[in-house]
């Protein structure tokens, strides 16, 4: 997510903090789509103000785990994590309105609380009464808004490289895009995404590039701007401190978009656990899904 003074855009209990051990098993770049083993399903939910694309994996009677993607992304960003999580959880992924395979209307609100409301409505339609909610990057902002709107639905939260406030943002080189020449080229998308990874040679899955191209200029710029507006109103730790929800914060120690040291700002939330991940950048869910999934599963298991 690119943030400027005018908003994110592509131009136009006790607390604990520790460093998670680094591990490299040679598979950190794997991008394995979930397999259709009888527990996998994809559908479109028609809500009053837009259609949402939903994927479900894992046993339907297992504890629900909702995964929320970030800006200029889609539920496919979690693909490498799903096989590692679905053995213990009913994993639910939703393309937020304006993203991926969901609807992209120009006449609907993309404000963060409205995105969160739609997610809650989708879970209601799926019969989910309680869920742990994990969000990557600005997906953590939507997860926070969902916990504010539906505290009875959200049992616990995990935020992965979600900047706590705008002060934590690392200024980026603006990437100009011309709405008259939409959609962007692969090269433009990859230039935009280069600061999302700790290594400049990280190979971004083509599926994710294609999903970004599905967005419209309006939905891309508007959703980014609305994330900034939500953060301007109130920092995430201030929002979370009074909710009383178990909270895990994971942060790549080499994040090039949000200052990794800003993760300490979440320590004001009672009972929070903060994990800094050496060797990883803004997108641990792709850079090292095994390590990220292990930490997430440890969190969900301990809180049962």
What are these regions (language model features)?
Residues 36-51:
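N-terminal cap/lid segment of alpha/beta-hydrolase-fold proteins
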Residues 50-101:
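Conserved HGGG/HGGXW glycine-rich cap/lid loop of the alpha/beta-hydrolase fold
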Residues 77-79, 102-108, 169-170, 260-261:
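Conserved catalytic-core motifs of eukaryotic protein kinase domains, centered on the activation segment
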Residues 83, 247-280, 286, 291:
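Conserved loop-alpha-helix segment in the C-terminal half of the alpha/beta-hydrolase fold
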């Amino acid at each position: 997510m690119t943030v400027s003074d005018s908003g994110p855009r592509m131009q136009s209990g006790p607390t604990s903090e520790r460093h998670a051990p680094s591990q490299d098993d040679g598979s950190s770049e794997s991008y394995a789509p979930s397999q259709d083993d009888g527990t996998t399903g994809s559908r479109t939910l028609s809500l009053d103000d837009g259609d949402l694309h939903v994927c479900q994996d894992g046993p339907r009677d297992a504890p629900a785990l909702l995964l929320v993607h970030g800006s200029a992304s889609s539920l496919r960003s979690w693909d490498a994590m799903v096989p590692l999580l679905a053995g213990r959880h009913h994993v639910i992924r939703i393309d937020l309105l304006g993203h991926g395979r969901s609807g992209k209307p120009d006449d609907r609100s993309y404000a963060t609380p409205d995105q969160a409301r739609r997610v809650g409505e989708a879970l209601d339609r799926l019969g989910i009464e309680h869920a742990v909610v994990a969000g990557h990057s600005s997906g953590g902002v939507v997860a926070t808004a969902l916990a504010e709107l539906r505290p009875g639905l959200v049992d616990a939260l995990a935020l992965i490289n979600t900047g706590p406030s705008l002060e934590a943002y690392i200024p980026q080189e603006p990437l100009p895009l011309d709405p008259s020449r939409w959609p962007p080229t692969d090269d433009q998308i990859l230039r935009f995404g280069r600061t999302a990874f700790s290594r400049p040679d990280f190979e971004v899955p083509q599926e994710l590039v294609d999903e970004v191209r599905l967005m419209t200029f309006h939905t891309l710029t508007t959703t980014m701007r609305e994330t900034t507006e939500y953060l301007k109103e109130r920092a995430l730790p201030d929002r979370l401190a009074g909710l009383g929800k178990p909270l895990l914060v994971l942060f790549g120690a080499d994040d090039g978009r949000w200052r990794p040291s800003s993760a300490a700002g979440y320590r004001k939330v009672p009972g929070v656990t903060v994990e800094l991940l050496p060797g990883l950048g803004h997108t641990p869910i792709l850079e090292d899904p095994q390590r990220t999934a292990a930490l997430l599963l440890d969190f969900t298991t301990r809180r049962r």
